[in-house]
Design a protein with these regions (language model features):
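Cleavable N-terminal signal peptides
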Residues: 7-8, 18
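Ankyrin-repeat-protein effector appendages
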Residues: 8-10, 114
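Positively charged n-region of N-terminal signal peptides that target proteins for export
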Residues: 1-4
Length: 115
């Protein structure tokens, strides 16, 4: 039992690092409405009002954007690998050069376009 826990620890640590973001990046987004090229991997934006935010080039791997309002947001060149956009409003959002790999899209399909 003890041996299996010790063997699992490196994997748990690695997984935690994949889903972490710097708190100052989240605070920057909340206060300024912009966080271009920020790493917000694993952030929970469930039902968040993110209208017209600037997330140009942001890293949003594993981010929960479910039912969030991203209308008019700049997501150009953003990386959204394994992000969840189910029910999100992307009306007039700039998605130019955004990367979606195993991302749940607003209507529930999974994008494998950029994998």
């Amino acid at each position: 039992m003890k041996k299996s826990i010790l063997l699992a620890l490196p994997f748990l640590f690695f997984a935690a690092k994949l889903h972490s973001y710097k708190l100052e990046n989240l605070e920057k987004l909340q206060t300024t409405g912009a966080c271009a090229k920020c790493d917000l991997s694993g952030a929970n934006f469930y039902e968040a009002d993110l209208q017209e935010v600037n997330l140009n080039g942001a890293i949003l791997h594993h981010a929960n954007l479910r039912r969030s309002n991203l209308s008019g947001a700049d997501l150009s060149s953003a990386m959204l690998f394994r992000a969840d956009l189910f029910g999100a409003d992307l009306t007039n959002a700039n998605l130019e050069d955004a990367k979606f790999c195993n991302t749940i899209l607003p209507l529930g399909s999974i994008s494998v376009k950029d994998c």
